[in-house]
């Protein structure tokens, strides 16, 4: 049980931990100043807690989120919601972004300006070709990512953090930003929430279930116990690297001009690497960032292809994997900025819906809930999420004004109280539904 859980946990941590997870903690460390400890506590509590809880809820029943959403809300909604989620977080956003991030941070600085355009094409051809070859055999990713690549990038990050702590430890942190001075834990909590990692948890729960089935279990008790081991491994690995990277950012001296943009994480990683490793710094950074991004790319291709193959089996897994790899490659080279412009609002809409679904599933594990009440809850959260994005991102003023009067709107959580009210109503409305108890196949 412990071995199966540890292996699966390392695999999931490897595909979870991407470029954004490298950059956010050093930024928080620099911006939180003397309030680092409560800030990183809030960040870990939400960023790790929400993601791991969403992952566990999605794997407790081997039928996954598609079954939970279909039975509690509606089959058509489950297919629509998950299709949009997988496409948004996969080939149309995160997959190409991981490739371009690996190139821009790790490879581009090694090239002359004249060769950077050609360099991107060559790099992404090799990058996506390697990811595609691994993704063609999903049953092998436990060995190739969980046993090999995850330890590689984790060790590289640990080396950077340890050497950074030795070199910069004891340095007085810079003054905290106004937000962290006002509420360090609260600001850290919101930064963790805004990583959107719960969306990846939904996507990667498919890989978790398939990997656990592949390992085999003698009983439902062993399966469930292993899932909790998986959650603990992922949580500990994330927390350790988040705290280490955050401490590096907190101790590293960042000039004022690098702080102005509000996200000094990339500057800290590149400059700290340069000062610690000297002439080999860029090679170290290239290896660390590329491997970190690559594992996420493989995970996204596999999970997206597996989902669509399960929902629409007329097309083979290989065709889906090929299509999503080619789409990611094309966008990485032709139009990433435009795609990100439209993908991020979609992800921001999906996020509160995802959290609301997880809340419903958790409560329904303990008490019966009304199906109309659950449907109403998700409908209200969806409307608020869409109105919030249209109001803030697309400047629809009357919608922005409507959303702003809701509780916690300033904290980017206008949907939270309506979701809680909807769940409470589900306790008293008719047509109550017990949580399904699964049996091992």
Residue ranges with predicted function:
Residues 60-64, 68, 126-149, 214-217, ...:
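Membrane-water interface regions at transmembrane-helix termini and the short interhelical loops
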Residues 135-164, 343-355, 374-382:
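Membrane-interface loop-to-helix entry segments
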Residues 9-17, 163-169, 179-245, 284-293, ...:
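Hydrophobic, membrane-embedded alpha-helices of multi-pass small-molecule transporters
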Residues 91, 95, 154-180, 198-199, ...:
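Hydrophobic alpha-helical segments and their helix-loop junctions in multi-pass secondary transporters
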Residues 49, 53, 152-164, 227-253, ...:
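Selective recognition of specific alpha-helical transmembrane segments in multi-pass small-molecule
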Residues 65-71, 241-294, 345:
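TM-loop-TM module centered on a large, flexible mid-protein loop between adjacent transmembrane helices
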Residues 137-148, 185, 208-237, 255-267, ...:
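Hydrophobic, small-residue-rich membrane helices and short re-entrant helix-turn-helix hairpins
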Residues 167, 370, 374-441:
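A generic transmembrane alpha-helix motif of multi-pass inner-membrane proteins
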């Amino acid at each position: 049980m412990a071995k199966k859980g540890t292996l699966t946990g390392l695999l999931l941590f490897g595909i979870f931990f991407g470029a954004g997870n490298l950059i956010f903690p050093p930024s928080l460390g620099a911006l939180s100043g003397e309030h680092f400890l409560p800030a990183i506590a809030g960040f870990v509590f939400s960023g790790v807690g929400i993601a791991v809880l969403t992952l566990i809820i999605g794997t407790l029943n081997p039928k996954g989120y598609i079954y939970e959403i279909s039975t509690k809300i509606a089959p058509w909604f489950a297919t629509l919601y998950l299709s949009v989620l997988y496409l948004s977080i996969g080939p149309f956003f995160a997959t190409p972004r991981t490739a371009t991030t690996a190139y821009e941070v790790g490879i581009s600085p090694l090239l002359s300006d004249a060769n950077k355009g050609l360099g991107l094409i060559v790099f992404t051809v090799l990058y996506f070709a390697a990811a595609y070859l691994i993704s063609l055999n999903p049953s092998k990713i436990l060995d190739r990512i969980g046993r090999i690549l995850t330890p590689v990038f984790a060790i590289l990050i640990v080396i950077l953090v340890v050497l950074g702590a030795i070199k910069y430890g004891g340095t007085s942190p810079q003054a905290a930003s106004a937000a962290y001075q006002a509420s360090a834990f609260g600001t850290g909590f919101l930064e963790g929430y805004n990583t959107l990692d719960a969306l990846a948890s939904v996507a990667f729960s498919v890989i978790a279930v398939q990997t656990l089935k592949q390992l085999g279990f003698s009983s439902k008790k062993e399966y469930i116990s292993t899932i909790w081991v998986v959650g603990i491994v992922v949580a500990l690995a994330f927390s350790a690297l988040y705290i280490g990277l955050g401490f590096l950012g907190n101790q590293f001296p960042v000039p004022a001009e690098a702080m102005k943009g509000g996200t000094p994480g990339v500057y800290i990683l590149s400059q700290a690497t340069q000062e610690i490793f000297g002439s080999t710094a860029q090679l170290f950074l290239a290896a660390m960032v590329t491997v970190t991004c690559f594992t996420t790319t493989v995970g996204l291709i596999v999970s997206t292809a597996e989902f669509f193959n399960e929902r629409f089996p007329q097309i083979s897994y290989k065709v889906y994997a090929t299509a999503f790899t080619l789409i990611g490659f094309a966008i990485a080279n032709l139009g990433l900025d435009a795609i990100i412009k439209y993908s991020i609002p979609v992800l921001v809409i999906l996020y509160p819906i995802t959290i609301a679904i997880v809340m419903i599933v958790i409560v329904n594990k303990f008490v019966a809930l009304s199906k109309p009440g659950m449907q109403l809850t998700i409908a209200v959260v969806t409307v608020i999420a869409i109105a919030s994005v249209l109001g803030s991102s697309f400047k629809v003023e009357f919608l922005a004004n409507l959303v702003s009067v809701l509780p916690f709107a300033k904290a980017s959580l206008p949907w939270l109280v309506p979701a809680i009210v909807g769940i409470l109503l589900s306790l008293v409305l008719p047509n109550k539904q017990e949580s399904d108890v699964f049996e091992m196949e």
